[in-house]
From Swiss-Prot:
Function according to Swiss-Prot or TrEMBL: Exhibits a very high intrinsic GTPase hydrolysis rate. Involved in the addition of a carboxymethylaminomethyl (cmnm) group at the wobble position (U34) of certain tRNAs, forming tRNA-cmnm(5)s(2)U34.
Domain of life: Bacteria
Protein name from the UniProt record: tRNA modification GTPase MnmE
Subcellular location(s) of the protein: Cytoplasm
HAMAP family, A to Z: GTPase_MnmE
Gene Ontology MF annotations: GTP binding; GTPase activity; metal ion binding
Binding annotation for GTP: 226-231, 245-251, 270-273, 335-338
Amino-acid positions noted as binding (6S)-5-formyl-5,6,7,8-tetrahydrofolate in the UniProt annotation, renumbered to this chain: R24, E81, K120, K456
GO annotation, cellular component aspect: cytosol
Organism of provenance: Pseudomonas fluorescens (strain Pf0-1)
Similarity remark: Belongs to the TRAFAC class TrmE-Era-EngA-EngB-Septin-like GTPase superfamily. TrmE GTPase family.
Cited InterPro entries: G_TrmE, GTP-bd, GTP-bd_TrmE_N, GTPase_MnmE, MnmE_dom2, MnmE_helical, P-loop_NTPase, Small_GTP-bd
Cofactors (names): K(+)
Note describing how the cofactor binds: Binds 1 potassium ion per subunit.
Amino acid sequence: MSAPRETIAAVATAQGRGGVGIVRISGPLASVAAKAISGRELKPRFAHYGPFFSDNQQVLDEGLALYFPGPNSFTGEDVLELQGHGGPIVLDMLLKRCLELGCRLARPGEFSERAFLNDKLDLAQAEAIADLIEASSAQAARNALRSLQGAFSQRVHNLTEQLIGLRIYVEAAIDFPEEEIDFLADGHVLSMLDKVRNELSTVLREAGQGALLRDGMTVVIAGRPNAGKSSLLNALAGREAAIVTEIAGTTRDILREHIHIDGMPLHVVDTAGLRDTDDHVEKIGVERALKAIGEADRVLLVVDATAPEAADPFALWPEFLETRPDPAKVTLIRNKADLTGEPIALEVSDDGHVTISLSAKSAGEGLDLLRDHLKACMGYEQTSESSFSARRRHLEALRHASDALEHGRAQLTLAGAGELLAEDLRQAQQSLGEITGAFSSDDLLGRIFSSFCIGK
């Protein structure tokens, strides 16, 4: 696979003024541009300081010129970088000079796209470049760097290699029936299949954690009217984002607030109080609240610790558990601890349920416990050298692969259908290939790289 032969150019540094600005060129005309702009032959992979010339030999700027002949460059093509002063006018003049020499303006992400097309990066590594640039916390940046260095891709590659080995064994048995391999009696296929499924499950769990660090966690605040949901939102946001009154049902619609906790992005959603009501508008708000609960990464179920219902909070709204079937993603918040006198604390039950006693109003007592808990849910303390950045599309691909393997196992154990297992293995391999770009449509590639910065 090779990239187009046009030569592209773009400003690679951020818009605005700065001490240094970089113009990047990639393609067959890079060597021509290097000599025309610097006025001399450039030694590959050396930094040359000097003037940058226009077509009539006027000096446009001065700085460093670096020439990287392909394939030993970022894109795999001939690459020229001009590092001058970071003023927008100077950079525009340099870019205009590149266009005069036959270059065209690069599309967003086109340099990374060419690196992918020339096998310098796989798709997950290319996406990690954008993730590293956009990282909103040190942990997210570390994860993105590990993905750029190939940590995620290597995990996917290992899974793919195991699937290929399994496919070879299964398809050989199908193609050569005279060997009379009994899949079930053999036990080899089932053992290999379960090994891949277990490893895939681990990668999917770690990818989910990486996606939370990259995209941010959606936290929905739910509970009865007047439990203190809006007060909790305001306390987390550090401002009066929601109206707070003593009137039950003040919040009737979804209210979203984007906050950061030590650089970790959270999308906090305040919802209407859960109760039966004849008010048409409030009823719509309750329906939207239940929908938001079902889509949340984490639910904070707020109860008024002074109310009798606090003794059995999960019984206060039956539809709640139906909407949020995974209790492990629900944190119980016992609010108004300043009124009950109960200690500010975080407790974990034997079954793993987390309860935090706090006061959303009284100087935010207990908020630090909640913030630390939310950071832990996002993997803030995760220091594993194997952690990596992941995107939602990666999670979908991993889930599709997992579903295919589950289906294939059922075909094998319930029906002994080796032919159907072979097809499920093929689908699982294709889903994994979509992560690294081994199997990707042109439309998908276009959407991914168009989201990059120009010059990357």
